[in-house]
């Protein structure tokens, strides 16, 4: 999501929007997953995004119908485009044909970031999901929409995945008064994984004179002018074979590495040995070569040491740079209870020097996140699961929402509360209650939450496998029953999660309020009532010394005679 400023100076960083460096995508190809799924994760991170599950039912429209386009970020009206006669069912960012689209915003060159088109990046995602059946078709439709109606956002990286293929598409507008965009899309090789996190990542590629969309041998698509436009704008003067999309249209800088690429590094490091060679780069040390291009960047994709499951994906989304020198649990910013979160802004200055707060994958301002699981060996009627969640990925639970459901569970439905309208009936608010309470004493409280996350996640994985065995037996005979079954299951799982998290908050608040840790005890014989066991944990010696030094002895016990 929005918005990153290129050529960042620290003063500009201080002025960055509330949504800076938002969103993370991890992409797993069929050959890299434990069961042959294609998977893609997405965290929609914004201080002003309310977490809810969008739904567009499949519909038939009269010929000539027009579709209003409203900017996803702001709600601003952008214009109208022709509607197609038939649209598809979309649940969040996954449709009924097992197509999923996610994104992260890299913004790119400022002069290219103010086009006056109709199609913003959010509308491109959700309109395309209603119209496309495969990743290749989605790339064609999305780029055609931009060409026909103009682009209305800054630079974007899109993850476009179906049950067989996973693609990365990077796109940026042409600036004020210029319609369309320049773009390139690459197929991730099977058996590999990729990621992006608010920094453009496609570098060199084999330029295509023609996009033969449905030729399986073509693994690169691009706009005709992706290189010539860069020459026209005096961004590039080398050979076509040397042209790097990212280094030309969104050169990586300190912020792009430290706040963005470091999240890609954390994922890559979790799945493949040897990633320490890119650690200096991820921290923000950029080396430059010909054309000013960075020379020490990470590869666009890597082959993992072992195959990846959806349970692994849930874990990757909870990363806080644990185990690295930037592990946020270990410095003074963590407070006395090892909190791996830092409140914004991410940049600050003192005594004439500039500093940063780290930006990890899991962050407090997430509106919603998901892992799309797309499975070619299952019928589309129940082949795709949108493992959907709300709030901070570090504290959330991913609930299995089949992409064909037609009834969205009430706790996750659009219109059930908003960012300034609290309700206990909303999963977003209940999960925020738990996470925000846990931030106060992370070391003590989070382990209890983690147990509940694992219990629910393993239960959901087991239950979906059992359900799908049953559905395989009936899907050809009774498709209506299949639809009823997936609706019932996803709604039941969501309602159960919502209630369990309300119960969890009640348990945690009762146990940990007022700085104590209370344990219920049985009432002994002969007693009318009995107080709970109360424990009070001392601060670490490190924090005791910090207090002593900061208070300059004022808190020292005065001994008689002193």
What is each PLM-predicted segment?
Residues 1-5:
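Positively charged n-region of N-terminal signal peptides that target proteins for export
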Residues 7-17:
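Bacterial N-terminal signal peptides
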Residues 18-22:
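Sec/Tat signal peptide C-region and signal peptidase I cleavage site
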Residues 23-121, 141-308:
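A contiguous strand-loop segment
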Residues 113-115, 123-132:
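Second-shell loop/turn segments in exported
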Residues 267-355, 359-361, 447, 451-455, ...:
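Accessory, solvent-exposed terminal regions and/or long lumenal/extracellular loops of proteins
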Residues 332-473:
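Substrate-recognition/cap regions that form aromatic- and gly/pro-loop-enriched pockets
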Residues 454-562:
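Histidine-centered catalytic/metal-binding microenvironments
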């Amino acid at each position: 999501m929005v918005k990153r400023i290129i050529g960042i100076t620290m003063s500009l960083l201080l002025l960055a929007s509330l949504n800076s460096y938002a969103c993370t995508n991890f992409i797993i190809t069929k050959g890299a997953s434990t069961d042959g799924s294609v998977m893609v994760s997405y965290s929609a991170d914004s201080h002003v995004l309310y977490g809810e599950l969008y739904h567009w039912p499949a519909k038939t429209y009269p010929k000539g119908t027009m579709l209003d386009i409203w900017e996803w970020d702001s709600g601003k009206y952008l214009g109208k485009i022709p509607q197609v006669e038939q649209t598809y069912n979309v649940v969040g960012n996954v449709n009924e044909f097992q197509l999923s689209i996610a994104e992260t915003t890299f913004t790119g060159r400022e002069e290219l970031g103010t086009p006056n088109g109709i199609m913003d990046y959010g509308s491109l995602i959700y309109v395309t999901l209603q119209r496309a059946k495969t990743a290749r078709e989605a790339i064609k439709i999305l780029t055609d929409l931009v060409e026909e109606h103009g682009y209305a956002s800054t630079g974007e990286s899109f993850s476009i995945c179906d049950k067989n293929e996973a693609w990365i598409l990077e796109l940026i507008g042409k600036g004020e008064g210029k319609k369309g965009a320049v773009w390139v899309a690459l197929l991730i090789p099977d058996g590999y994984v990729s990621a992006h996190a608010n920094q453009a990542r496609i570098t060199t590629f084999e330029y295509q004179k023609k996009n033969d969309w449905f030729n399986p041998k073509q693994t690169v698509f691009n706009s005709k002018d992706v290189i010539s436009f860069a020459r026209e704008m005096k961004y590039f003067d080398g050979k076509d074979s040397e042209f790097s999309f990212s280094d030309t249209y969104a050169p990586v800088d300190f912020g792009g590495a430290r706040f963005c690429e470091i999240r890609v590094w954390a994922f890559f490091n979790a799945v493949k040995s040897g990633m320490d060679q890119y650690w200096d780069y991820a921290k923000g040390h950029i080396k430059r070569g010909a054309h000013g291009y960075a020379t020490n960047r990470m590869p666009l994709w890597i082959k993992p040491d072992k195959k990846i499951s959806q349970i692994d994906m849930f874990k990757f989304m909870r990363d806080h740079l644990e185990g690295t020198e930037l592990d946020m649990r270990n410095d003074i910013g963590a407070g006395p209870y090892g909190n791996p979160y830092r409140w914004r802004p991410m940049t600050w200055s003192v005594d004439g020097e500039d500093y940063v707060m780290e930006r990890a994958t899991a962050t407090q301002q997430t509106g919603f996140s998901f892992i799309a699981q797309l499975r070619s060996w299952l019928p589309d009627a129940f082949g795709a699961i949108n493992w959907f969640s709300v709030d901070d990925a570090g504290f959330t639970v991913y609930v299995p929402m089949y992409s064909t459901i037609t009834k969205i569970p009430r706790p996750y439905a659009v219109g059930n509360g908003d960012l300034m309208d609290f309700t206990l009936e909303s999963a977003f608010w209940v999960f925020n209650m738990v996470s925000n309470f846990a931030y106060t004493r992370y070391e003590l409280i989070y382990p209890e939450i983690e147990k509940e996350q694992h219990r629910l996640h393993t239960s959901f994985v087991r239950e979906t496998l059992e359900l799908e065995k049953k559905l395989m037996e009936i899907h050809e005979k009774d498709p209506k029953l299949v639809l009823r079954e997936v609706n019932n299951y996803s709604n039941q799982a969501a309602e159960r999660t919502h209630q369990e998290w309300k119960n969890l908050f009640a348990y945690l608040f009762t146990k940990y309020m007022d700085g104590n840790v209370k344990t219920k005890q049985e009432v002994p014989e002969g007693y009318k009532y009995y107080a709970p066991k109360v424990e009070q944990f001392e601060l670490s010696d490190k924090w005791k010394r910090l207090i002593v030094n900061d208070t300059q002895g004022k808190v020292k016990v005065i001994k008689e005679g002193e």
